Structures are given as structure tokens and as C-alpha cells.
């Protein structure tokens, strides 16, 4: 590889490991972005279901369990829905924390790799 001053930068085994690690982190970052989007949609759907349940005036409502709808008392459905909302919020929070951790690791690797290779390496997305 050519650096800006005309000398070749030697890529060591450690450098290659850092480049590979950055690539894996970048892939996981994109996976997390998709997972976060889906988790937010699930949270919105649960919130909408809760709002619809408030408007419902029946004692027994249909509740989806897997592929099937079951008739359940309104109180049980409300309790299950609240638990599902809590679980979804915790999952979203965990995904956001993992995303922040990955961004920090990627920033550290960028600093190391750009410090050695300068303009000879591109770690930015277009």
C-alpha cells in the first residue's frame, strides 16, 4: 500500500486482525440497526394494541398466541400485553446499548488504523 509520502505501509498480522474485527463490527452494526427498527415497530404495535384494548368494551377478547387466536378475559390480556411491552422495551434498550458499544469499538479501531495507514485505507461508508 502506498502512503501519502511515497513509502509502503507494511500490513502486520495485528493490523489485519484489526481490519477484520472492524469489518465484523460493521456487519453487526448494520444487523443491529435492522433489529432496532423491527423492535421499535413491535413496540408501536403493542402500544396500538393496548390503545385498542382500552376502547374495547367486551369482557372476553381474542388474543393471538403464536398462530392461533384464543378467547381470554380482558384482565388477562391487559396483564399479558403489559408484560410484552416491558419485555419489548428491555430488548430495545439492550440493542441500543450494544449498538453504542459497537460504535465506540469501531471509533477506536478507526483511530488505530487511520493512525497507521492514513489515506491508504478507507473505513467510511459511502
Curated annotation (Swiss-Prot):
GO terms for molecular function: unfolded protein binding. Gene3D superfamilies: 1.10.287.370. GO terms for biological process: protein folding; response to cold. GO terms for cellular component: cytoplasm; prefoldin complex. CDD domains: Prefoldin_4. Keywords: Chaperone. It comes from the Eukaryota. Binds specifically to cytosolic chaperonin (c-CPN) and transfers target proteins to it. Binds to nascent polypeptide chain and promotes folding in an environment in which there are many competing pathways for nonnative proteins. Heterohexamer of two PFD-alpha type and four PFD-beta type subunits. Belongs to the prefoldin subunit beta family. This is Probable prefoldin subunit 4. It comes from Avena fatua.
